UniProtKB/Swiss-Prot annotation:
Stretch forming the signal peptide: 1-24
Effect after changing residue 1068 to F: Global loss of autophosphorylation. Abolishes stimulation of cell proliferation and cell migration
Domain Ig-like C2-type: 30-127, 151-213, 219-326, 331-415, 422-552, 555-671, 678-764
Family: Belongs to the protein kinase superfamily. Tyr protein kinase family. CSF-1/PDGF receptor subfamily.
Mutagenesis / variant outcome for changing residue 1114 to L: In LMPHM1; loss of kinase activity
Result for mutant: residue 1231 to F: Loss of phosphorylation site. Strongly reduces stimulation of cell proliferation and cell migration
Pfam hit, one: I-set
Residues given in the record as ATP binding sites: 851-859, 879
Catalyzed reactions per annotation: L-tyrosyl-[protein] + ATP = O-phospho-L-tyrosyl-[protein] + ADP + H(+)
Record function comment: Tyrosine-protein kinase that acts as a cell-surface receptor for VEGFC and VEGFD, and plays an essential role in adult lymphangiogenesis and in the development of the vascular network and the cardiovascular system during embryonic development. Promotes proliferation, survival and migration of endothelial cells, and regulates angiogenic sprouting. Signaling by activated FLT4 leads to enhanced production of VEGFC, and to a lesser degree VEGFA, thereby creating a positive feedback loop that enhances FLT4 signaling. Modulates KDR signaling by forming heterodimers.
Protein name in the entry: Vascular endothelial growth factor receptor 3
TM regions (residue ranges): 776-796
Ranges where the Protein kinase domain occurs: 845-1173
């Protein structure tokens, strides 16, 4: 195929070269052995003509239209063409042989170069005209129709076989003789006749005489035609597509002058093979003639594809029209993007096209969709046209194409991004035009656009006029807004001297469902009028808001003042001042409302409008104060020298807006109180007072005007002094510690302008002053002593209740603390927040999609610009509150921030990166982002990709070993290598996070999941929990859902308390009003509400079960109810997953020890798992893979895989395990037999072995359960508060054993349900062991100090087979 294509290419180049030579006339023509132009032979003779040339040759003669393509072809009708011997100058030679020629062989014999298209006489061809004389048939033409038009002359083709004859032309009415002018004879072409001579002829014949005999040629029927062709059309106009086997029909139509004649000819690929036929048609119209030729080919094939040319000729004009015919073997649909998958437009565009490159046959059905919804209307499959593009036009547009008959379907999607010019929303609402002097003002611009503008620029200029110009309105089409054209704008800075700037902040805020850019300029002190503008722009436009910041000394620019301002009394002078700023208002007027106009005829109050206040009020004469030079306000004063009751009423000041000419008014009501004489409401009475007692006398008065009150004693003016007080406008007289000289006559005198009134009384004093002084001393001393003791008791109580500062700070390091002991708010008071280190600018944080919602918070993916040194943009997770969060929720998130700061950074903990705490926006806590989500979902998704024997790359193994080595180095040198470990892996992780997808070293979704990965995840979780334990932090909810997976196989412990909706999480069970993860909780946490690091170790064992079951839900098929809690406390445990090796099973069982003290510490777990990850067990992995153990049966398909971790890994690890784990080691093969810690008795630890019974042997009460193991819900698992109270009550009342002495070992059993559902007590030693319960963590009872025991515990496994 390739060789043939190369050969064709060379041939094409050669032909092109030859064509070029021909066009330049530089080619040597072929030569004939007959040199004369005409050669004459007789009928029956043989003809032999040889031709030589420089290139391959071919012959053409009257007996054949074309020479054979290759080789020789013998035929008596067509003659014989043979090769002959050439010469050096002309190596190619062809000879043409004709035997027994006859008259019809008369004609032109042409020799030409075979591979050159152009036949040019004397250049690429040579010819000779041969006459074959037949004296019995001198004329050789056939009957034909001769089309005669209005041209000057035309040929009558009377061809002869004998040259030199005398020929005349005869019609039905005349004979024409050649005269060399109007009638000319040519032996080769016939008779050339002037057209006007033929208009009356019906037919024409040529006549000659040879010897004594006359000969006539075949007649030519004369048809007089028009000679103008108007147009030609080939239908279908466009290229025609067909399938193999279909019919091709082409219609070539010519519009010509009336009664015109046209000769049609077709050129197409199948013409030589005589495929198809064309049929002429003629339709005469009133003004013209339509002539058609219809080409039809049945059952088209691949050979019929190509160019089809229709040629029309009337002898004067030649028309040509062509089309392409494409033949397909099978139906097909091909669609591609024409301009790429993402197209951009601008809001407001009148027309936008979404084009695609479509090739299909037959034409398919199609439908356009936008964001999954079908679009109505008529559309084209080649382009979707959108009119009046808006922001709502943004979306994904999908073109669906289908051919139901052929079963073909194709889809293509295009993303349209509509860019929106920025708009400032404050322009839509009216803003104040006047601002009070010395006030604090905030100017705000809220902008929205696509793309979102990231910044808003502020400018200012002095208060001077600006020119106005017209600009197209962005909000009202076909309208224009008048915009001021101002110059001399300056950038606003915080050091602006005109009006002091307090702050200038810009941030992104989620408003009305959109992210908008908000900028606030706070002016600390408005002193000077100025013009401000905010400018916002993006790549498709710009918008600006002009703010006229006019500063005035008059509040709101218009006010009324009254002097005096308090209640008016009859006779006082009153001054009403109406002040208005001259910049905004003019035409000040005073009115007094008529009382009759305030109510209608029915007494209902009228609503008065400032626009027509003059209709309801009486104008008043007032004086306009003179305005000082430079002042911008006017004051219209209304003065009343002596106010009287008739002046009481409503006074209105009316002003007019300078620009809008609207009327504005303020109303002031004057209330006038008439004067009246004072009167006493209570007279003074005589009093008898003891020495040192208190004395109080009241002179209560009434009157319209506050009168003056004066006190006299024994007709002398009484004034205030030490021990004598006058209060309540002198109406009350008080004397403290009365003495003998205070006795006498007291007079109260009350006066005003209308008159005076008096009242008097006598005061008598009895007793001795010495006795009174002693009583005072005793009372004061008693009070001082009582206060002293009260303060002392208060200090003692506070010291007992509040621990020392250091104790509180140390204890708070445990994040999960009982709030009943120390409230969370009080704990956080001792943790600081360093804004200089952790505060991150809001404008460099771009919020993205929501990762999770909670009851009152959410976690959002975001892009932080410059949060790490040396990086431009990092993906982070942002914890924030929902809208409408309460103050307590805000304090809770702030507490979490302080706790994260205090804990510090660690590789295997989700670390704090920064925070946004400033009041300009919501509180946001920025933490690391883990791209692979939580470990539980990741393991489930990777089950199909689990390949236990897959080889890890040297880089991955090196990374695993580095984790272990650095962890051990950290343990030997605390506080040093931890930072090295975090820095090393966080740098790798951060580099992967910031690298492009093409540069990312590894994608965990593409790589297989191996046993090494599971051990590595377990090791890292233990490492992170070891760090939290060292910081005295108790997690309390350690589970695979709270473990996140990041780049480079790094896992991180998290607890997104705000993001997790525990009320919907099926892993949680409600306890009263709270929800508890009972499947992960240790028995002491369930029954005693005790949370310690050892209870986290229990949860770590459940987490191991999740990891090695590839994300399954713990306790599959088990109903979480009261019986579950009892069985868990009694020693029943889960059965290990089949992927767990003996070493992993042993770790699980030790983590599930009923005695918290017997559980391993996280430091021990780090050492053991580190040995498994790095030790010799993994080095022998290849040997293990060749001898896999048989898998356990499980309903879950992914659990039936063959475990490839070696059994001897566990045995090898057991040799290096700490003693605390070795003495509970599990036999390699019999993983249903365990040695489990029992109870402690007086510090002595006794352990024994007993056979473990699986859950299949002793199942729980049957329950109906539906659902998968992975998504096991806790429907019906909610334990009400009453149920927990019953459990706790039993756990206090039931004394499961009675230990009477150190030497006695008493068996204690608990009832188990029998086959009928009744509870029975197991016999001693049943099923291979006795049941004992630990007094502190097992039975949940309260034994006396004498109680002690030393039993062995029997432990039952929950197995997934029970499901």
């Amino acid at each position: 195929m390739q060789r043939g294509a190369a050969l064709c290419l060379r041939l094409w180049l050669c032909l092109g070269l030859l064509d070029g030579l021909v066009s330049g006339y530089s080619m040597t023509p072929p030569t004939l052995n007959i040199t004369e132009e005409s050669h004459v032979i007789d009928t029956g003779d043989s003809l032999s003509i040889s031709c030589r040339g420089q290139h391959p040759l071919e012959w053409a003669w009257p007996g054949a239209q074309e020479a054979p393509a290759t080789g020789d072809k013998d035929s008596e009708d067509t003659g014989v063409v043979r090769d002959c011997e050439g010469t050096d100058a002309r190596p190619y030679c062809k000879v043409l042989l004709l035997h027994e020629v006859h008259a019809n062989d008369t004609g032109s014999y042409v020799c030409y170069y075979k591979y050159i298209k152009a036949r040019i006489e004397g250049t690429t061809a040579a010819s000779s005209y041969v006459f074959v004389r037949d004296f019995e048939q001198p004329f050789i033409n056939k009957p034909d129709t001769l089309l005669v038009n209005r041209k000057d002359a035309m040929w009558v083709p009377c061809l002869v076989s004998i040259p030199g004859l005398n020929v005349t032309l005869r019609s039905q009415s005349s004979v024409l003789w050649p005269d060399g002018q109007e009638v000319v004879w040519d032996d080769r072409r016939g008779m050339l006749v002037s057209t006007p001579l033929l208009h009356d002829a019906l037919y024409l014949q040529c006549e000659t005489t040879w010897g004594d005999q006359d000969f006539l040629s075949n007649p030519f029927l004369v048809h007089i035609t028009g000679n103008e062709l108007y147009d030609i059309q080939l239908l279908p106009r466009k290229s025609l597509e067909l399938l193999v086997g279909e019919k091709l029909v082409l219609n070539c139509t010519v519009w010509a002058e009336f009664n015109s004649g046209v000769t049609f000819d077709w050129d197409y690929p199948g013409k030589q093979a005589e495929r198809g036929k064309w049929v002429p048609e003629r339709r005469s119209q009133q003004t013209h003639t339509e002539l058609s030729s219809i080409l039809t080919i049945h059952n088209v094939s691949q050979h019929d594809l190509g160019s089809y040319v229709c040629k029309a000729n009337n002898g004067i004009q030649r028309f040509r029209e062509s089309t392409e015919v494409i033949v397909h073997e099978n139906p097909f649909i091909s669609v591609e993007w024409l301009k790429g998958p993402i197209l951009e437009a601008t809001a407001g565009d009148e027309l936008v096209k979404l084009p695609v490159k479509l090739a299909a046959y037959p034409p398919p059905e199609f439908q356009w969709y936008k964001d999954g919804k079908a679009l109505s209307g008529r559309h084209s499959p080649h382009a979707l046209v959108l009119k009046e593009v808006t922001e709502a036009s943004t979306g994904t547009y999908t073109l669906a194409l289908w051919n139901s008959a052929a079963g073909l379907r194709r889809n293509i999607s295009l993303e349209l991004v509509v860019n929106v010019p920025p708009q400032i929303h404050e322009k839509e609402a009216s803003s104040p035009s006047i601002y009070s002097r010395h006030s604090r003002q905030a100017l705000t611009c809220t902008a929205y656009g696509v793309p979102l503008p990231l910044s808003i620029q502020w400018h200012w200029r002095p208060w001077t006029p600006c020119k106005m110009f017209a600009q197209r309105s962005l909000r009202r089409r076909q309208q224009q807004d008048l915009m001021p054209q101002c110059r001399d704008w300056r950038a606003v800075t915080t050091q602006d001297a005109v009006n002091p700037i307090e702050s200038l902040d810009t941030w992104t805020e989620f408003v009305e469902g959109k992210n908008k850019t908000v900028s606030k300029l706070v002016i600390q002190n408005a002193n000077v009028s100025a013009m401000y503008k905010c400018v916002v722009s993006n790549k498709v436009g710009q918008d600006e808001r002009l703010i006229y910041f006019y500063v005035t000394t008059i509040p709101d620019g218009f006010t009324i003042e009254s002097k005096p301002s308090e209640e008016l009394l009859e006779g006082q002078p009153v001054l009403l001042s109406c002040q208005a700023d001259s910049y905004k208002y003019e035409h000040l007027r005073w009115y007094r409302l008529n009382l009759s106009t305030l109510h209608d005829a029915h007494g209902n109050p009228l609503l008065l409008d400032c626009k027509n206040v003059h209709l309801f009020a009486t104008p008043l004469a007032a004086s306009l104060e003179e305005v000082a030079p430079g002042a911008r306000h006017a004051t219209l004063s209304l003065s009343i020298p002596r106010v009287a009751p008739e002046h009481e009423g409503h006074y209105v000041c009316e002003v007019q807006d300078r620009r809008s000419h609207d009327k504005h008014c303020h109303k002031k009501y004057l209330s006038v109180q008439a004067l009246e004489a004072p009167r006493l409401t209570q007279n003074l009475t005589d009093l008898l007072v003891n020495v040192s007692d208190s004395l109080e006398m009241q002179c209560l008065v009434a009157g319209a005007h506050a009168p003056s009150i004066v006190w006299y004693k024994d007709e002398r003016l009484l004034e205030e002094k030490s021990g004598v007080d006058l209060a309540d406008s002198n109406q009350k007289l008080s004397i403290q510690r009365v003495r003998e000289e205070d006795a006498g006559r007291y007079l109260c005198s009350v006066c005003n302008a209308k008159g005076c009134v008096n009242s008097s009384a006598s005061v008598a004093v009895e007793g001795s002053e010495d006795k009174g002084s002693m009583e005072i001393v005793i009372l004061v001393g008693t009070g001082v002593i009582a206060v002293f003791f009260w303060v002392l008791l208060l200090l003692i109580f506070c010291n007992m209740r509040r621990p020392a500062h250091a104790d509180i700070k140390t204890g708070y390091l445990s994040i999960i603390m009982d709030p009943g002991e120390v409230p969370l708010e009080e704990q956080c008071e001792y943790l600081s927040y360093d804004a200089s280190q952790w505060e991150f600018p809001r404008e460099r944080l771009h919020l993205g999609r929501v990762l999770g919602y909670g009851a009152f918070g959410k976690v959002v993916e975001a892009s932080a610009f410059g949060i790490h040194k040396g990086s431009s943009c990092d993906t982070v997770a942002v914890k924030m509150l929902k809208e409408g969060a309460t103050a307590s929720e805000h304090r809770a998130l702030m507490s979490e921030l302080k706790i994260l700061i205090h804990i510090g950074n660690h590789l295997n903990v989700v670390n704090l990166l920064g925070a946004c705490t400033k009041p300009q926006g919501p509180l946001m806590v920025i933490v690391e982002f883990c791209k692979y989500g939580n470990l539980s979902n990741f393991l489930r998704a990777k089950r199909d990709a689990f390949s236990p024997c897959a080889e890890k790359s040297p880089e991955q193994r090196g990374r695993f070993r580095a984790m272990v080595e650095l962890a051990r180095l950290d343990r030997r040198r605390p506080g040093s290598s931890d930072r090295v470990l975090f820095a090393r892996f966080s740098k790798t992780e951060g580099g992967a996070r910031r690298a492009s997808p093409d540069q990312e070293a590894e994608d965990l979704w593409l790589s297989p999941l191996t046993m090494e990965d599971l051990v590595c995840y377990s090791f890292q979780v233990a490492r992170g929990m070891e760090f939290l334990a060292s910081r005295k932090c108790i997690h309390r909810d350690l589970a695979a859902r709270n473990i996140l997976l990041s780049e480079s196989d790094v896992v991180k412990i998290c607890d997104f308390g705000l993001a997790r909706d525990i009320y919907k999480d099926p892993d949680y069970v409600r306890k009263g009003s709270a929800r508890l993860p009972l499947k992960w909780m240790a028995p002491e946490s369930i029954f005693d509400k005790v949370y310690t690091t050892q209870s986290d170790v229990w949860s770590f064992g459940v987490l191991l079960w999740e990891i090695f079951s590839l994300g399954a839900s713990p306790y599959p098929g088990v109903q979480i109810n009261e019986e579950f809690c009892q069985r868990l406390r009694d020693g029943t445990r889960m059965r290990a997953p089949e992927l767990a090796t003996p070493a992993i099973r042993r770790i699980m069982l030790n983590c599930w020890s009923g005695d918290p003290k017997a559980r391993p510490a996280f430091s021990e777990l780090v050492e053991i798992l580190g040995d498994l990850l790095q030790g010799r067990g993994l080095q022998e992995e290849e040997e293990v893979c060749m001898a896999p153990r048989s898998s356990q049966s499980s309903e879950e398909g992914s659990f039936s895989q063959v475990s490839t971790m070696a059994l001897h890994i566990a045995q090898a690890d057991a040799e290096d395990s700490p003693p605390s784990l070795q003495r509970h080691s599990l036999a390699a093969r019999y993983y249903n037999w365990v040695s489990f810690p029992g109870c402690l008795a007086r510090g002595a630890e006794t352990r024994g072995s007993s056979r473990m019974k699986t859950f299949e042997e002793f199942p729980m009460t049957p329950t109906t359960y539906k659902g998968s193991v992975d998504n096991q819900t806790d429907s019906g698992m909610v334990l009400a508060s009453e149920e927990f109270e019953q459990i706790e009550s039993r756990h206090r009342q039931e004394s499961g054993f009675s230990c009477k002495g150190p030497g006695q070992n008493v068996a204690v059993t608990r009832a188990h349900p029998d086959s009928q559902g009744r509870r029975r007590r197991p016999e001693r030693g049943a099923r291979g062991g006795q049941v004992f319960y630990n007094s502190e963590y097992g039975e949940l009872s309260e034994p006396s100090e004498e109680d002690h025991c030393s039993p062995s515990a029997r432990v039952t496994f929950f197995t997934d087979n029970s499901y």
